[in-house]
Curated annotation (Swiss-Prot):
A single GO BP: translation
Region listing for Disordered, in residue ranges: 45-71
Keywords: Ribonucleoprotein, Ribosomal protein, RNA-binding, rRNA-binding
GO cellular component: ribonucleoprotein complex; ribosome
Extent of the signal sequence: none
Keyword RNA-binding recorded: yes
Task performed by this protein: One of the primary rRNA binding proteins, this protein initially binds near the 5'-end of the 23S rRNA. It is important during the early stages of 50S assembly. It makes multiple contacts with different domains of the 23S rRNA in the assembled 50S subunit and ribosome. Forms part of the polypeptide exit tunnel.
Coiled coil: none
Protein name from the UniProt record: Large ribosomal subunit protein uL4
Gene encoding the protein: rplD
Ribosomal protein as UniProt keyword: yes
NCBIfam families: rplD_bact
GO molecular function, one term: structural constituent of ribosome
Protein family: Belongs to the universal ribosomal protein uL4 family.
Amino acid sequence: MELVLKDAQSALEVSEATFGRDFNEALVHQVVVAYAANARQGTRAQKTRAEVTGSGKKPWRQKGTGRARAGTVKGPIWRGGGVTFAAKTQDHSQKVNKKMYRGALKSIFSELVRQDRLIVVESFGVDAPKTKELKAKLDAMQLQDVLIVTPEVDENLFLAARNLYKVDVRDVAGVDPVSLIAFDKVLVTAEAIKQIEEMLG
């Protein structure tokens, strides 16, 4: 199959296995959920009444003071006491094997092609790290909500895009399922397309 280059009167021959396969919604959902889960730190932690530092002594005698009876200063109704159902550190990570991950990326790229959301250009960049220059380029292409994928990190492009809302720049190695589906359009250079094909086999 062929992908038409937007900035040149030509087309790029690509593998149908990577850019023309059926959309596997269940697989994409599983990989996206796992990717988001793996980004979680899971370091939230609170202390129960057994773990709070403090004396185990009864604060005052049971009867005769006129105050409510109390057996510990570490109970959950006390300020500085333990938490009733204390949160503990958790490992939220989910295993996704390489075949599943690559399959999900292929499904996403294929769906982007079908929906005309994948824009392929011969090359894309800016001469200086100027947001104004990049904004003018994107406006000329009628792109506001876009992920730009280049073969390798272009510092000028990265710095120029940093202050633009709903614009992000990634190299091929930094592409992930969540970022691909988060943007309205995905702008990819011809060289990056070749690298994606090699990466996804």
